[in-house]
Amino acid sequence: LKNVKFISSNPELYPPLTQLLTAENFTRPKDVAKSILSLLKQDIQIKDLLLKKNSAVSLNEATSISRKLDKFPLLHNLMRVCPLPDLEFEKFFITMRRLFLRNLNKVEVSPELIYFLSTLSIQCFINEYVYIESDEETHLISELEAEISQNLVQLMQPEAINILCLASYRPLHQYDWCQKLESLDNLGEVKKRLIEEPLLEKMIAKDIPMLEEISDDVSLKVRGQYEENPY
């Protein structure tokens, strides 16, 4: 499957490929990601969504798209285990992410939308927030950070959708208040992947013994990268 490129649609392959991704130690997701994406891009619904990526300018359309993507657990599972090596999908999700950030106060929350934003936040964490970000988005994220922080100071829990939107732009574990987010208690995988595991890795990194003091610039940079991502 590693070097296979699909040229026609075959939805019957979705369940076994989903199982392939979720079975532990069976294959490395990044080795089959391009093949799986080539299959998904032959699906008429996915084709239609990708063609509309630059015209998805309304909140209603973005919400509708999140519902349609709910029918593709194969895509969701792939996004939760490895970066998507595909520029079309990247542009598509950049557009979706921006739309929901701009319209957070107007969004009609649904299980499908929460599932989509959960998947998107995990994907952005995995790809180390490589998606391009406009100045407008940076400003809106700063406002969202302040709003969530203020909510917690006032002993109010932020809406899950607000946290997920922030998590698609910034690593949640970097915030001092991340362990106070009870809104994520019903989103176990998000909480584990974006908060609990990174914090555990930080603790492990601190406990790694250092034989001698590091002084040269290159070694300091390497140590800094390792402490950020021990694995």
Locate predicted features.
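N-terminal accessory segments
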Residues: 1-224, 228
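Hydrophobic pocket-lining residues within nucleotide cofactor-binding pockets
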Residues: 231
